[in-house]
Amino acid sequence: MLFRSTVDLLPLAQEAAENLRAAAEAKNVSIIVSGENAPVIGVRRLLYEIAYNLCDNAIKYNTDGGSVDVRVGAEGGSACLTVRDTGIGIPPEHQSRIFERFYRVDKSHSKASGGTGLGLSFVKHAVAYHHGTIALKSEVGKGTEIAVRFPQEK
């Protein structure tokens, strides 16, 4: 059974980033979390996995010396978690499919970086479970930004 409670996205994002710090350092990628408290009612484990998967992908598909910027905030009745990287980016023709199970943009890169191809599919379903939305912006050679928004209880 999934237990819902009040979960603040800022310390959750900080925890996910800290747990990925060694992976980021191994790729010479900096990861910074900033923002403000943004509480939501949800399943802590699922919300953590959303933050973790987004940060993990931002590190895996980044460039040497790149960066990952994680921002958390509350705006217009929503809590928002945004992960922006300076990585390889996603070609426009693949952007509509990256949240599908097992879908990989570059299968050769995926073998080198590991993973199952389920991370972003999980993110999509966990965000939907929390009645949230996902927005993607990406440019090849410049990086990717994924923003997830969750309704905040009044």
Predicted region positions:
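Conserved micro-motifs of the catalytic ATP-binding
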Residues: 1-3, 35, 39-45
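A conserved beta-strand-to-alpha-helix junction within the catalytic ATP-binding
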Residues: 5-18
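Short conserved segments within the C-terminal catalytic ATPase subdomain
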Residues: 23-33
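Short beta-strand/loop element within the Bergerat-fold HATPase_c
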Residues: 65-77
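Acidic ATP/Mg2+-coordinating residue in the GHKL
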Residues: 85
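Short conserved segment of the HATPase_c
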Residues: 90-104, 124
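Conserved glycine-rich
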Residues: 131-132
